[in-house]
Amino acid sequence: MSKIFKNRLEGLRALNRGVRALAKAVTSTLGPQGSHVVIKKDHSSPYVTKQGASIAKEIILPDAFENTGLKLIKEAALQMEAQVGDGSTTAIVLTDALFASGLKGVAVGLDPLEIKQGIQLAGAMLDEELAKLVVKISESEDIFHIATSSANHDAAIGKILADAIAQIGIEGVLSIKEGRGTETTLQATRHVGLNSGYLSSYFVTHPETMEVIYEDASILLCNQALSCLNQSFIHFLEQTFQTNRKPLIIIAEDFDPELLSILIVNKLKGNLPVCAIKAPGYGQQCKETLEDIAILTGATLVGDLLGISLSESSLDVLGRVEKIIVKRNTTIFSGGKGNQESLEQRIDYLRQAIVQSSSEMDTQDLEKRLARFVGGVAQIYLGSATENEYKERKIRLESALKAVKAAFKEGCLPGGGVALARAASIIKIPNELPIGVMFGCKCMLQSAEEPLRVLATNCGKDPEYVVDTVLKHADPYFGYNCINDSFENLITSGVFDPFSVTKCALKYSISISCLLLTSSFFIVDSSEKMQNPPLF
């Protein structure tokens, strides 16, 4: 397959046109007064969005070199969406401004490596100044403002997410499902749960609700399948029946049908209030679930493979809960009697494992396990009039959730592009720097004002006037509120940006811009359709 080549300046200009094309498409969407973009795919209905990452996914340019520039900045936008859920448009705006200004230096003969050094130097100083502006959030109203902003100013999504987090905590597990009709509803519980229920309806104690409900119940956890041939289990059951009249909940890998019948008969005769539950999952996942429940209830996980046989166990292996509610497919524990030190150790372990996890699936499993200890579980049934509206609102809600979690983790900055502009205005560039490094610093600091300028433009304001008015004010949190068209303290009025979102947008824009500016030769496949637009 033949290749096509371009030299440094010609190639950089072509890549810059690709970056600029994507920036033009998403710039008008930034902020509460930003416009929507209509996207129509083959064999599907058109849908409307303001998500920068969603727009970036759909744009392809006919020129192979321009498309290369677009693909690189698109990757930054998609990384932003995956990592922190918000800020993809800001990252694109920053990259466009930074690359375009840096390219001017390359065009007049400045050393690209010095320009890169200057950009990175100013970027590090911006990070330091931004950290000084961080404020912590805690109130439900703060969550509402952040979620609403990250959901493209959808107040309904902001409210439902704030309500969910108020009920299950920031470390709870939230799932999104399609609702019935246009109404969005929330179901949440803070109790510990299992995605598994009773194995037979004969265990039910409350027929009107088809639930098994016991108070002050004992918990037996077995990391093995149980059968009536297992004499050690039968002996343990008899011992429990004779000395412990509390309800017995047995959670095991599996149950032999004959053993299940024996348990049902004992329950129906009133000999022993009992319920059998099959542990969810298989293999290691099942074992980890049982270990979590053991720590929560104070039980000892028994099983031949663990070296802890029922034949050698006393009633001390039983855990306890204040109350348990078992349905056909779910189990809810309340008031587990686990050791507090063991609980804290397991919570620390799970939090550390989440930080170190590199797999999204593993991270989700770990978050669900952590929710058993410190949070709860919530389901949002998202209302919508059409399937496309549901998909778009689901993307907004997922983005808002990531942004809120990011805000809790690292705090917030005054929003509306103000934090970057104010941090840039504080930084003083050392005079003794080489000319290329100094130029790179200036490129970075000037580009940091671009998100604020774009927001002002989208609100119909003079960007120069807005920037000057904001930066002249002594209050570091003073800025322009696009929602009510006023200058005020943005923290007080609830205009936030998660610190990690701004930090990531800065990081990715610097990374992509420096990568492009220090490239000197460009190669693409000639099989890609080519056009020859005039160089600027």
Swiss-Prot record:
EC no. given is 5.6.1.7
> Which GO molecular-function terms appear in the entry?
ATP binding; ATP-dependent protein folding chaperone; isomerase activity
Q: Where in the cell is it found?
A: Cytoplasm
- List keywords of the entry alphabetically: ATP-binding, Chaperone, Cytoplasm, Isomerase, Nucleotide-binding
Which cellular component, as a GO term, is one annotated location? cytoplasm
Q: Which CDD domains match?
A: GroEL
- Cystine bridges: none
Pfam families assigned to the protein according to its UniProt record, in alphabetical order: Cpn60_TCP1
* Keyword Nucleotide-binding on entry: yes
- Principal place where this protein is found? cytoplasm
Q: How does it assemble?
A: Forms a cylinder of 14 subunits composed of two heptameric rings stacked back-to-back. Interacts with the co-chaperonin GroES.
Give the protein's biological function: Together with its co-chaperonin GroES, plays an essential role in assisting protein folding. The GroEL-GroES system forms a nano-cage that allows encapsulation of the non-native substrate proteins and provides a physical environment optimized to promote and accelerate protein folding.
What the record says about family reads: Belongs to the chaperonin (HSP60) family.
Q: What is this protein called?
A: Chaperonin GroEL 2
- This chain is encoded by the gene named groEL2
